[in-house]
Amino acid sequence: MPADRLGAHMSIAGGLHLALERGKTTGCSVVQLFVKNQVQWAARPLTDEDVRRFKKARRTTGITEVFAHSTYLINLATPAEAEWRRAVDAFADELGRAEALGLRFVVIHPGSHKGSGLEAGISRIVAALDELAGRIRGYRVRIALENTAGAGHTVG
């Protein structure tokens, strides 16, 4: 890894591997990307070919430091049980995708407590992270919580 690092969030349009090629073209040594469409819950599974192309692009571009960012739909702080369960399951899927790609971190905004209060929101986040820790036991990928400006009911 170069001493001077420059990174950007790159589009995965056309394939995950293309995000690395776009990063290289723009002079990046670090790239952040989504491991699936950032505004949809559903995603087709990663294929062996997707993973092979991505790992090859890491080698050929020299961009070895790649961070994933979770989709914007995931809200680990929500008080609504069905929404919380869907968020935890979706984030577990994204962590699995990142693991398959050999990524070290998935960045996530903790979410919004939607008026239930900061303490309640933090409790929901902790419960989600506890469950996820069990579900990703043995994975190398880690969760990186990204702070927010704290507007409205956001936590972090």
Residues covered by each model-derived region:
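N-terminal pre-domain/capping segments
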Residues: 1-70, 74-93
